[in-house]
Amino acid sequence: MENPLEHLHNETHQAWEANAEVWDKRMGDEGNDFFNLLCWPALASFLPSKSDAHILDIACGNGLTTRRLAEMGYQVTAFDFSANLIEYAKQRLDKYGSKTSLHVIDATNEAQLLFLGKNKFDCALSNMALFDMANIEPLFQTLPQLLKPGGTFIFSITHPCFNNASSMHVVEEMDDGEIKTIYAIKTSRYMTPYSMRGLALRNQPKPQVYFERPLQYYLNLGFKNGFVLDGFEERAFPPETPQTTPLGWGGKFSEIPAALVIRMRLNS
């Protein structure tokens, strides 16, 4: 019998297999505003300085970050647990064949991760994926074996404080001698990890499961497995960013970070 975590993991896997086509069409080769305005600038700034570094792209989806990395000259090994997403990635990355290697691997499975090879990678990267994983402990435990001494793990996540599944976007009027419109975030859950179903794209066939964890969970898990924190950037949309919906993420929330990008380094 499946335990609750295994059940949620299997549900997540089924959701991403079902949603792969819709996700690939939406993200394409260029991604969305979350990727281009929030995540990628910080991720890119944290990458290794040597252009021939070997990077592990964790939960690569349709190959969005893989392509960017290959274009920068890096050697990239990428994987995802969705076979459907890997097929889309192969199609989009065909011309980068000499620079990229794609695999169907489950990031929650230590044995599958070790298949990639020990002391092989200068850097591991995960863009907006850790909160889609039912259990991230096997990944953090295995990365020190996959990375070279002093290697780095760079990851972006939705900001645990302000952009979690319990967050509500609020607009209010305030009068302090003049009428001001205030855009704010109201959140009711943070400290205790929990899971909740949601839609990343409104037309996706199957809801996915979000696994919400406080910031201390991610950092302490890294510290426990030999990493130190050496890069930290909270990312908010610029004020001029258009709103896709009246209360969606955009320039109206320019004082509230929607994403967080972290670099951790093995303490060699």
Label the predicted regions.
Residues L113-C123:
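A short acidic, Gly/Pro-enriched loop at the edge of an enzyme's catalytic core
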Residues E137-T152:
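A short glycine-rich, Lys/Arg-flanked "PGG" loop and its adjoining helix->strand segment in the class I
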Residues M1-D24:
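N-terminal, positively charged/glycine-rich alpha-helical extensions of SAM-dependent methyltransferases
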Residues F155-N220:
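SAM-dependent methyltransferase
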Residues Y217-S268:
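C-terminal lobe and adjacent flexible extensions of AdoMet/dcAdoMet transferase-like proteins
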Residues C123-I136:
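A short SAM/SAH-binding and catalytic strip from SAM-dependent methyltransferases
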Residues D33-D52:
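Conserved alpha-helix/loop element of class I SAM-dependent methyltransferases that forms part
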Residues H54-I58, N62-Q112:
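Class I SAM-dependent methyltransferase SAM/SAH-binding core
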